[in-house]
Amino acid sequence: MEKEKFQQKALKQTKQKKSKSAEFLMVKEERAATEGIENPAFNISSTDLSAYQTSEEEVIRHDKLHSTLAAHQQKLRLQAHAEPRGNEYSRNYFDLLMDEEINPRQCGMEVSEEDPVKFQEQILYGKLMKLLDEASKIIDSQVPVTGEDFSDSVMPVSFSKTRDLHRELGDEAIPSYIEQFEREVQNDIIMFGSFSLEQDSKHHKEASHHNKKNCNPGFMSSFKDREASRWQQR
């Protein structure tokens, strides 16, 4: 019986201790919630405050980081604001229009159906003029050709190139003024080989005529008599 009483007493004491400790903890938590967490830096009883004080260098560094972050965020905001929002904000309205964006109907320049044809004719005419210039440069720089090379140089350079140009064009209609231009130019072109042959034949005729004039008639008659006597001896 005594043992049981002693055990009941011990259990009561332990229960009372546990309840007191729980009450103490609850009161402490309520105080911390109402008064706030105590900052050791402002505690007067604590003598060592150096552990809780931040140095000036750390404060300056912290301020620098804050300033750089703020500047970076501001820069990002400006870039996002400056980015185009669709086609209407892609370019400033005060900028000059590009060539491909100019509408001729808005500017009062009506495009007729004949303009592309005229443009192609101008291109062909420019190509022909360029070929003729090249041919004239070759004629000026080339040495006169002899009679043996006549077959290679009879065809002018410009006509071979115009033929290639006609092949490139294919089935496209060649304007009439280009054909007329070729006919007129063909009459004025001097063939390389024919020009050299005419010079050689003219020079040969002049030389033979000059020799005939300079020959002595007495010498010719004596030469004929000698040839006749030689034939009689045979």
From Swiss-Prot:
This is Orofacial cleft 1 candidate gene 1 protein homolog. PANTHER family: OROFACIAL CLEFT 1 CANDIDATE GENE 1 PROTEIN. InterPro entries: OFCC1. Residues 1-21, 201-234 are annotated as: Disordered. It holds the Pfam family OFCC1. It comes from Gallus gallus. Residues 202-213 have a biased composition (Basic residues). The gene is OFCC1. Residues 223-234 have a biased composition (Basic and acidic residues).
